[in-house]
Amino acid sequence: NLLQFNKMIKEETGKNAIPFYAFYGCYCGGGGQGKPKDGTDRCCFVHDCCYGRLVNCNTKSDIYSYSLKEGYITCGKGTNCEEQICECDRVAAECFRRNLDTYNNGYMFYRDSKCTETSEEC
């Protein structure tokens, strides 16, 4: 769920999802259009695509289990939806960590109206 995803992001990056990732670029936060602005925004694009492949799953509220050991997130057992949501969130949180050095404060609270390029396919 969203609270778990926020916790995962904090554990991986040291940053809170809000404000650092909730409204970043063209894809972080609700919806998305255009081309991802940088590596961090691409993490969100891939996360959106991952969620988009999940059928009949409540990505915002399904509670999953995971553990953090020696800096690695491991998703636990649960329903098919819970396990898949956890994997989508884990991959995104790790992607955010890999892209910390290119995080651009100029893309925080970025306006959707600036995301006018043709959207990519998942």
UniProtKB/Swiss-Prot annotation:
Query: Which cofactor(s) does the record list?
Result: Ca(2+)
Look up keyword Lipid metabolism and say if it applies.
yes
Tell me where in or outside the cell this protein is found. Secreted
Q: Quote the CDD domains the UniProt record gives.
A: PLA2c (cd00125)
Q: Do the record's keywords include Acetylation?
A: no
Q: Which reaction(s) are listed as its catalytic activity? A: a 1,2-diacyl-sn-glycero-3-phosphocholine + H2O = a 1-acyl-sn-glycero-3-phosphocholine + a fatty acid + H(+)
Cofactor: record remark: Binds 1 Ca(2+) ion.
Expression by tissue, per the entry, reads: Expressed by the venom gland.
User: Which cysteine-cysteine pairs are annotated as disulfide bonds in the entry?
Assistant: C26-C115, C28-C44, C43-C95, C49-C122, C50-C88, C57-C81, C75-C86
Q: Which GO terms describe its biological process?
A: arachidonate secretion; lipid catabolic process; negative regulation of T cell proliferation; phospholipid metabolic process
State a single Gene Ontology molecular function: toxin activity
Listed EC numbers: 3.1.1.4
- Give the family per the record: Belongs to the phospholipase A2 family. Group II subfamily. D49 sub-subfamily.
Protein's job: Snake venom phospholipase A2 (PLA2) that inhibits neuromuscular transmission by blocking acetylcholine release from the nerve termini. PLA2 catalyzes the calcium-dependent hydrolysis of the 2-acyl groups in 3-sn-phosphoglycerides.
Q: Could you identify this protein by its name?
A: Neutral phospholipase A2 agkistrodotoxin
What species was this sequence derived from?
Gloydius halys
Q: Tell me the lineage of the source organism.
A: Eukaryota, Metazoa, Chordata, Craniata, Vertebrata
